[in-house]
Structure formats: structure tokens, C-alpha cells
Amino acid sequence: MALTVKEKKNVEVVVPQPRQKHVIQGEPTVAYETRDLNLWYGKDHALKNINLSIYEKEVTAIIGPSGCGKSTYLKTLNRMVELVPSVRISGNISYRGRNILDKSFQVEELRTRVGMVFQKPNPFPKSIFDNVAYGPRIHGIRNKKILSEIVERSLRGAAIWDEVKDRLHENAYGLSGGQQQRLCIARCLAIEPDVILMDEPTSALDPKSTLKIEELIQELKKEYSIIIVTHNMQQAARISDKTAFFLNGEVVEYDSTDIIFSNPSDKRTEDYITGRFG
């Protein structure tokens, strides 16, 4: 539901309120359905016939050795991969029943529904408050009270509010690496996405900060669908519900994380997770 706020000059701004989250009963709901997805960088065939169903309110881990297509696949889910001039894509990626590769699907709409957290924390050279308020402002929200509510809610959602509530107007660069990454997660939450993509979100962090992010992911999956690329096998086993193993641009195996790590059906999966290669 939206709240209409009258600002100066009697201009009405429609402020998005947190969308009601529904408990999924019975069969899980599909967030993304990827069918026969192929992707080329020039002549390099980077993704080959990818078929995956990714479910809502779960953590899905994408694992595999460097260069296997993990991050490329992740970036197809919000069409960031299209920023590469030589890229060519075929197949279908359905998000909640709509093909996001259809040119009629507006990228701006997609990216308000699908947030992304990158490998290295990338706060803007602004205050902590302005980092989180940036997205809502882009979408037309100017009312200070509403912005303050969004900022607090997002920082609480990213489990960093208590650490920064007295320094909201300090530069975000003054935060530690782990705090910066949680700030970036808060910035992502501020636009109320349905899906959060995470590309190696803890690889640049120390073990203590990594643990905080992992605990946060477990909380966030109650409200959001999370897809995480990771090289860390132990991390994938700890935090994910399902795991897809990529190799040479193909999905070798996709199943519940318990099965992937305890009883994989493909020897290549077993060899990878036990460290025989990769």
C-alpha cells in the first residue's frame, strides 16, 4: 500500500510502503525460472543451456571454480551483464512469470525488484544516511520524515543500526569493511526489493565480519529471496537451502544443499567440493 505525502507547492509524492510479506504454504513459489539460457562474450560461449528454478524465501548458492560462469549468471538475473558491449544472449529468464530478457521489460523496474550486493563494499562518498536514502530519493521521495523512517528500517534490517545510529551524518568511508558491506545491504533494502543478489559478499572480510553477514543472510531470507555466488564451500553448506554447481559454463548439478554436500549424483560435483580440483 502506498502513502501519499503532500510536500511544498502541493505536489503529491507517492511513497512506497514495505510490501506485505506472505507466508508460502505447500509448494514453494518460483522466483526465477531459467530455461535454455545461453550467453556469449563475443565468440566465448560463457553460459551453456542453463536450466534452473530458483525459489522464493530461500538462499540459493552458486558454486564452482573461477571462470565457470557463476557471476555471469548472477548478472543476467538483473541484466547487468548487458553493460558488456559484446554480450549476446538467447533463451528465457522468467521472473515471477515475466521474461526479463524481453525488451519490453523495463530494466529500471527489474532493478527495483532485484537488488545486488557486490564482492567489495562500495559505499558512496556520502554520509551513512545519504547512502541509504539514495535509492528512495532517486524514486522521488523527498519528505525528510519518510526518508528517516526508511533509513532506520533499512539499517535495522541490515543489523547495523545500533552501531551507526549516532553517526548517521558521518562519511561512510569511516566504517570498517564489514560495516560498509552491511551498509551496502541496507542501501539495497531501502528500495524494498523481492530478491537480493550477492556476488562473493564476504570474500574481502575478516572471519568475524563474515559471520555477521552470514547470520544476517539467515534473517533476510525470511523476507527476501537470496542468490549468492561463493567460492567458500563451507559457507555454501552453512547458509544455503539449495546449491547449483557450475563448471565450464554449464550447470552440472542442482539440488538441496544437504544432498549436494553429502550425496552428490555427479562425480565432478564430489571432486570439486572435496577439493580434488578448483
Swiss-Prot record:
Its EC number(s): 7.3.2.1
InterPro entries in the cross-refs: AAA+_ATPase, ABC_transporter-like_ATP-bd, ABC_transporter-like_CS, P-loop_NTPase, PstB-like
Example GO biological process: phosphate ion transmembrane transport
Keywords: ATP-binding, Cell membrane, Membrane, Nucleotide-binding, Phosphate transport, Translocase, Transport
Domain ABC transporter residue range list: 32-273
Topology term for the membrane: Peripheral membrane protein
Any one GO CC term of the record: plasma membrane
Residues given in the record as ATP binding sites: G64, P65, S66, G67, C68, G69, K70, S71
Main localization category: membrane
Highest taxon, organism lineage: Bacteria
MF annotations from Gene Ontology: ATP binding; ATP hydrolysis activity; ATPase-coupled phosphate ion transmembrane transporter activity
Gene3D superfamilies: P-loop containing nucleotide triphosphate hydrolases
CDD domains: ABC_PstB_phosphate_transporter
Subunit text: The complex is composed of two ATP-binding proteins (PstB), two transmembrane proteins (PstC and PstA) and a solute-binding protein (PstS).
Identification of the protein by name: Phosphate import ATP-binding protein PstB
UniProt source species: Halalkalibacterium halodurans (strain ATCC BAA-125 / DSM 18197 / FERM 7344 / JCM 9153 / C-125) (Bacillus halodurans)
